[in-house]
Amino acid sequence: MTRYFCCGSYFPGYPIYGTNFHGTFRATPLNCVVPLGSPLNYGCGCNGYSSLGYSFGGSNINNLGGCYGGSFYRPWGSGSGFGYSTY
C-alpha cells in the first residue's frame, strides 16, 4: 500500500468522487506525494485532515465539498486528500 497525500490540482480534470477507494485511487497518480502542510494546497485546506476525520475510509463531515463547494464529498479525487493506494 502506497501512502500519498495530494494537494491542489494535480489532476484537475477529475470530478470530486465519493465512490469506493479502488475507483478513486486507481485514477490517482502515484507520484502525487507531498508532505502535510505543503504550499501546494491551493486554499483547499490540506492541513489536519486526519484530525478532522478524513482518515482511510473518508468521512461525511467534509464541509469543504472537495474545495469546489457543496457538501458530503470525500476530500480526494479532485486532487486533495489523504489515503492509501491499493497499488
Curated annotation (Swiss-Prot):
Residues 43-84 are annotated as: 11 X 2 AA repeats of G-[YCGS]. Expressed in the upper portion of the hair cortex. GO terms for cellular component: intermediate filament. The keyword Oxidoreductase does not apply. Interacts with hair keratins. In the hair cortex, hair keratin intermediate filaments are embedded in an interfilamentous matrix, consisting of hair keratin-associated proteins (KRTAP), which are essential for the formation of a rigid and resistant hair shaft through their extensive disulfide bond cross-linking with abundant cysteine residues of hair keratins. The matrix proteins include the high-sulfur and high-glycine-tyrosine keratins. This is Keratin-associated protein 7-1. It comes from Homo sapiens (Human). The lineage of its organism: Eukaryota, Metazoa, Chordata, Craniata, Vertebrata.
